[in-house]
């Protein structure tokens, strides 16, 4: 059964039996939601997402572009790959470094080229 996770995104077409999936498991999402690009998918069921943001510098009264890397859980039904543009949402701590889960793939790497 597909749950409503509270975000206006298209649910995945595939079904999975992962308990840490927000669509098919019992994982609740809350808090911050980010867009980013997957830079690594080597760990099992984990992706590293890089997001860019602007930071205001008071001294120079200008903005600079910064980036941060976030580890996120990658459910089997979503299966994000390197180069994909994804939407990640905050959740409870899933491991030592994972506090986010991939909710949707906004653009596949093949479509972005």
Curated annotation (Swiss-Prot):
SUPFAM superfamilies in the cross-refs: Nucleic acid-binding proteins
GO cellular component: cytosolic small ribosomal subunit
GO process annotations (BP): translation
Alphabetical UniProt keywords: Ribonucleoprotein, Ribosomal protein, RNA-binding, rRNA-binding
A GO molecular-function descriptor: rRNA binding
Disulphide-bonded residues: none
CDD domains hit by this protein: Ribosomal_uS17
Record InterPro entries: NA-bd_OB-fold, Ribosomal_uS17, Ribosomal_uS17_arc/euk, Ribosomal_uS17_archaeal, Ribosomal_uS17_CS
Subunit structure and binding partners: Part of the 30S ribosomal subunit.
HAMAP family: Ribosomal_uS17_A (MF_01345_A)
Function, as annotated: One of the primary rRNA binding proteins, it binds specifically to the 5'-end of 16S ribosomal RNA.
Family: Belongs to the universal ribosomal protein uS17 family.
Name under which the protein is recorded: Small ribosomal subunit protein uS17
Lineage, broadest ranks: Archaea, Methanobacteriati, Methanobacteriota, Thermococci, Thermococcales
């Amino acid at each position: 059964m597909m749950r409503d996770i509270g975000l206006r995104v298209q649910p995945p077409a595939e079904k999975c039996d992962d308990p840490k999936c927000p669509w098919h498991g019992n994982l609740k999402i809350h808090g911050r939601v980010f867009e980013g690009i997957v830079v690594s998918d080597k760990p099992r069921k984990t992706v590293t997402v890089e997001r860019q943001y602007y930071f205001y510098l008071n001294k120079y009264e200008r903005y600079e572009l910064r980036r941060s890397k976030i580890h996120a859980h990658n459910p089997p039904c979503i299966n994000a790959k390197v180069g994909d543009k994804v939407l990640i949402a905050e959740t409870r701590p899933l491991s030592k470094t994972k506090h986010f889960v991939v909710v949707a793939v906004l653009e596949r790497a093949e479509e972005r080229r």
